Curated annotation (Swiss-Prot):
Organism: Rattus norvegicus (Rat)
Residues modified to Phosphoserine: S12, S16, S173
Known function: Involved in the assembly of C/D box small nucleolar ribonucleoprotein (snoRNP) particles. Recruits the SWI/SNF complex to the core promoter of rRNA genes and enhances pre-rRNA transcription. Mediates interaction of TELO2 with the R2TP complex which is necessary for the stability of MTOR and SMG1. Positively regulates the assembly and activity of the mTORC1 complex.
A Pfam short name: PIH1
Similarity annotation: Belongs to the PIH1 family.
Primary location: nucleus
Name of the protein in question: PIH1 domain-containing protein 1
Length: 290
């Protein structure tokens, strides 16, 4: 993910960062305060009642396992991409695409034969669920992500083989779930700021438009607009502890943003959104004590 050639020596000089960095720091710190105030002013979570969708059957070493795939309008939808775009992202092993879902607690149930089993409720966005109903590909993807999420959360080892129940949309009863309720404060788009390298007399790579926001106190997201590109081929990305550097193929783009937060570069991920022609970057933040 790193390419040290992208770091221009003159940009490492604090004096060259100029007014843009100062304004950026003010905007980012303001957004951090807004997020903290929002968390104080409202409950961190809200209760939702998912609606039934479909139920799949699999198993673990401890017996039968059923997963109720549910939906709720309160769950945020994933980024709107076509199946072709999503398939290409997955083939390129990019981790920028996420399907928000709520993983419920295990509950003991009885199957059709009256034998004991375990059921889990997994909720996704209602509009996305409607789209998933007409797509075997999305259904397979959601089940795979749900299964892996349950394995990670509860230390399970589930059989990847599964089948969907024909005549039951859920097993047992679907309980309420708690989801995070805070909104993400947008940070002013840096592409609109006046910078020395955006003056009309400047020649060389174009500085792309950058959007940043705090998804949570420990997660910073970025969108870099690259309208001249059709894919990620030739893109160079470097993420430092407080630096985001993007270089385009054939010197089309160059972005060097100093971020006054500590980024976990090892855990950061990026994906190219083909329809929007954007580079999406997910950057977990390090705690002050780490």
């Amino acid at each position: 993910m790193a390419d040290s050639k992208l770091l221009a020596p003159e940009l490492s000089d604090a004096e060259s960062m100029g007014e843009e960095t100062v304004r950026f720091q003010e905007l980012l710190l303001k957004a951090s305060k807004e997020l903290q105030q929002a968390q104080t002013a409202r409950p961190e979570s809200t209760q939702i009642q998912p609606k039934p969708g479909f139920c799949i059957k699999t198993n673990s070493s401890e017996g039968k396992v059923f997963i109720n795939i549910c939906h709720s309008p309160s769950i945020p939808p994933p980024v709107d991409v076509t199946e072709d775009e999503l398939l290409q992202m997955l083939e390129e092993d990019q981790a920028g695409f996420r399907i928000p879902m709520s993983l419920g607690e295990p509950h003991a149930e009885l199957d059709a034969k009256g034998q004991g089993c375990t059921a889990y409720d997994v909720a996704v966005n209602s509009n996305f669920y409607l789209r998933m109903q007409n797509s075997d590909f999305l259904r397979e993807l959601v089940v795979t992500i749900a299964r892996e999420g349950l394995e990670d959360k509860y230390g399970l080892q589930l059989n990847p083989e599964w089948r969907m129940l024909k005549y039951r949309s859920f097993l047992g009863s679907i309980s309420q779930q708690s989801i995070r309720s805070q909104q993400r404060p947008r940070i002013q788009e840096l592409g609109t700021l006046d910078t020395h390298d955006s003056l009309g007399t400047r020649h060389g790579p174009e500085r792309p438009h950058l959007n940043l926001w705090l998804e949570a106190p420990d997660l910073l997201l970025a969108e870099v607009d690259l309208p001249k590109l059709d894919g990620a081929q030739g893109l160079a990305l470097e993420i430092g502890e407080n630096r985001l550097v993007v270089g385009g193929p054939q010197q089309l783009y160059h972005l060097d943003a100093c971020i006054p937060l500590r980024i976990n570069s090892e855990a950061s991920r990026a994906a190219f959104h083909h329809r929007r022609k954007q580079l999406m970057v997910s950057m977990p933040l390090l705690s002050a004590s780490s």
